[in-house]
């Protein structure tokens, strides 16, 4: 009886060690993507050769990790491109971005960035027939019910309630450009869109100052 128990114990240990050994050789979805991207690094770097096909394949590979993941690739600067790993503004996909970024390969021609970064506001944003330039949008902070969030009013020149949806999309894109994907999703709460004819317009600030003013308030939130 004692020998039987001892044999069962040995078998269990062997199985446990065997499963552990197998797990060492089984790659995660993130590791598989990194391996694939390293193998195809030059092809992706020169994506202009066949942009649609290469970008489609990139998206397919990312979706194997998480269906909400997406990417951005910058123009060449000093022999390098930026590769942005994005959750497309979906908070639930943030951990997937963090995990993939933690396994980023070291490639001389690439700089990997997690989440869409802040960018200087220089260009107008157009959706359908509505175009808003930086001078046509201003902001004002408001208190949010969630104390860990910052509420904001965006004043868009030309805004009407009938076209609220389009101007809301434009306003969100400006926020994303100004503050970056991470800060918008983590710290921006209520977003209200209004026109230049709103009674509080005179209290508004030019959109170019949004990052600086936001960071002043954010410091107090994350303490």
Provide a role label for each language-model segment.
Residues 1-7:
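N-terminal secretory signal peptides that target proteins for export/translocation
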Residues 24-81, 87-223:
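Long, contiguous binding/interaction regions
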């Amino acid at each position: 009886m004692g020998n039987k128990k001892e044999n069962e114990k040995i078998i269990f240990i062997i199985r446990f060690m065997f499963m552990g050994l197998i797990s060492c050789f089984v790659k995660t979805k993130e590791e598989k993507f990194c391996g694939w991207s390293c193998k195809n690094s030059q092809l992706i770097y020169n994506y202009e050769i066949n942009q649609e096909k290469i970008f489609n394949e990139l998206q397919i590979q990312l979706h194997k990790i998480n269906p909400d993941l997406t990417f951005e690739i910058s123009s060449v600067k000093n022999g390098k491109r930026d590769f942005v790993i994005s959750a497309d503004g979906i908070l639930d996909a943030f951990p997937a971005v963090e995990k993939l970024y933690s396994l980023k390969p070291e490639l001389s021609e690439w700089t990997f960035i997690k989440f869409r970064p802040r960018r200087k506001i220089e260009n107008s944003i157009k959706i359908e027939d509505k175009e808003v330039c930086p001078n046509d949008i201003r902001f004002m902070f408001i208190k949010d019910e969630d104390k860990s969030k910052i509420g904001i009013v965006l004043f868009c020149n030309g805004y009407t309630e009938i076209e609220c949806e389009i101007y809301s999309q434009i306003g969100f894109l400006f926020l994303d450009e100004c503050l970056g994907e991470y800060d918008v999703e983590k710290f921006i709460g209520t977003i209200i869109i209004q026109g230049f004819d709103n009674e509080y317009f005179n209290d508004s600030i030019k959109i170019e100052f949004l990052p600086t003013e936001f960071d002043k308030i954010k410091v107090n939130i994350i303490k």
